[in-house]
Amino acid sequence: MSKKVEVNKVVVAYSGGLDTSVIIPWLKENYNCEVIAFVADVGQGEEELEGIEAKAIASGATECYVVDLKEEMVSEYIFPTLKTGALYEGKYLLGTSMARPIIAKAQVEVARNVGADALCHGCTGKGNDQIRFEGAFAALAPDLHVIAPWREWDLVSREECLDYLAERNIPCTASLTKIYSRDANAWHISTEGGVLEETWNAPNDDCWAWTVDPEQAPNESETISLKVEKGAVVAVDGKAMTPYEVVVYLNEKGAKHGVGRIDIVENRLVGMKSRGCYETPGGTIINEALRAVEQLVLDKTSFEFREELGIKASHLVYDGRWFTPLCKSILAASEELAKDVNGEVVIKLYKGHATVIQKRSDNSLYSEEFATFGADEVYDQSHAEGFIRLYSLSSRIRALNSK
């Protein structure tokens, strides 16, 4: 966006960190506009949110709105995505990606409520988040201007940002040295930068924030029971919980046993690769439980289709295409497939592993009578001959034609 565009009131996605603390006064100076701070509570922790309104006002914001999005994020964004089986590039449970559309949606709602004519985010010009936010803004509020300071200003270092605030007597608790870049919400925490920028470096202990080292985890395993209804975990160990409560509870259980760690080099949407240490303890447990019930209740073609949905959904969510017809269609299809995904799963947690050890479902298609190798009381093996001849017919014809 050009600086020549005139705006009167801007709603900025504010985190309380160094970048967004600089953005508020920068917006006022460069756009001569009123700045409203919007804070999304997505479960990043009380420590991150403590005193954040006062900090935003001290930076120059007229008002600061803190919006609790935790329950909605898990129930309306994370759990529906889980039903698709989405794992970006086979490993990543999309912790950061799934939080962005609801943050953008809530930011637009605040902008509408206060009569703002512009939106602002603090994403850099190298990452995925700029695309996720601006893609959501385009779908939800195409009439609002979007300001991306990192693509406009000439500040290039933490030192320059700190100097910028000091020159304006704006208080800031950030330090000059920041080893890692972290992003946390109720679902996961990511750690990037520092030693991780060299792929040959093994992660340090401080690359992990939530989970214990699996080698240092308890020597005694722990089992938990999860009740699944329509592709969502609704109770743990016999206690009914909301989706958010399920995630919080299982995060604590999984972290204690070192569950949910991945060290991944992923393909960013902008073309470059990035490395990060991601922790999703509760999500890893939930994903194992859902896939276990699916094994019982989905027939072969439904299971294959659900896998295809998962791959496509992972890219749509990662690429910031949540508010698109295709994403809505995939979520609707997975919702239909999940109608029979009901059951109970027992998972053993032990030194970094979440292992399914028991599973059952009233909708199970598994039949012990059909699967055993005993007497043919319910399955006549001679019937297989005709099926095989038809199944291999195209191969037979191709072979005959080649002679």
From Swiss-Prot:
InterPro entries attached to this UniProt entry: Arginosuc_syn_C, Arginosuc_syn_N, Arginosuc_synth, Arginosuc_synth_CS, Arginosuc_synth_type_1_subfam, AS_cat/multimer_dom_body, Rossmann-like_a/b/a_fold
A biological process term (GO) from this entry: L-arginine biosynthetic process
Subcellular location: Cytoplasm
Molecular functions per Gene Ontology: argininosuccinate synthase activity; ATP binding
Sorted UniProt keywords: Amino-acid biosynthesis, Arginine biosynthesis, ATP-binding, Cytoplasm, Ligase, Nucleotide-binding
EC number: 6.3.4.5
Catalytic activity reported: L-citrulline + L-aspartate + ATP = 2-(N(omega)-L-arginino)succinate + AMP + diphosphate + H(+)
Cellular component terms (Gene Ontology): cytoplasm
Enzyme class, first EC level, given as a word: ligase
Positions with a binding annotation for ATP: A13, Y14, S15, G16, G17, L18, D19, T20, S21, A40, G122
Matching CDD domains: ASS (cd01999)
Residues engaged in binding L-aspartate: T124, N128, D129
UniProt family annotation: Belongs to the argininosuccinate synthase family. Type 1 subfamily.
Protein name: Argininosuccinate synthase
Source taxonomy: Bacteria, Pseudomonadati, Pseudomonadota, Gammaproteobacteria, Vibrionales
